[in-house]
């Protein structure tokens, strides 16, 4: 099954965070035919390496993990899958950067499911 956006082209996604969860997300995106437009990470052991290697795919994807989030987001995508934290208050700047670049946000962060109890000001 290939995920597509409006029209005949595949969804373009940015993997924002390349730890364990970002690696799982990468594998799922590749399996489903999503076009990976970029990868953002901060670990010095991962930045500069190929996303396929970092995610344990056993092959290169031709997508380098980059530390400069603004540069990656500035190149555009349909969505960013944000996998870099657990709390809305600390995640908000990452979400805002995506949205400011016209990129929709998908996240695994648990607090975003029902933020009204833990981050009511941000939930508004």
Question: Predicted regions span which residues?
Answer:
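Rossmann-fold NAD(P)-binding glycine/threonine-rich loop
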Residues: 90-92, 96-97, 109-124
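N-terminal glycine-/serine-/threonine-rich beta1-alpha1-beta2 phosphate-ribose binding loop
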Residues: 1-101
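A short hydrophobic/small-residue beta-strand
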Residues: 104-106
């Amino acid at each position: 099954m290939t995920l597509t956006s409006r029209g005949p082209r595949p969804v373009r996604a940015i993997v924002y965070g390349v730890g364990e969860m970002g690696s799982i997300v990468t594998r799922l995106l590749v399996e489903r035919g999503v076009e990976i437009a970029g990868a953002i990470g901060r670990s010095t052991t991962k930045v500069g390496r190929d996303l396929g290697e970092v995610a344990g795919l056993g092959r290169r994807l031709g997508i380098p993990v980059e530390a400069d989030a603004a540069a990656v987001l500035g190149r555009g995508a349909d969505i960013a899958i944000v996998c870099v934290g657990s709390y809305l208050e600390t995640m908000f700047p990452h979400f805002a950067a995506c949205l400011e670049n016209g990129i929709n946000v998908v996240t695994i962060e648990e607090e975003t499911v029902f933020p009204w109890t833990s981050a009511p000001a941000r939930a508004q």
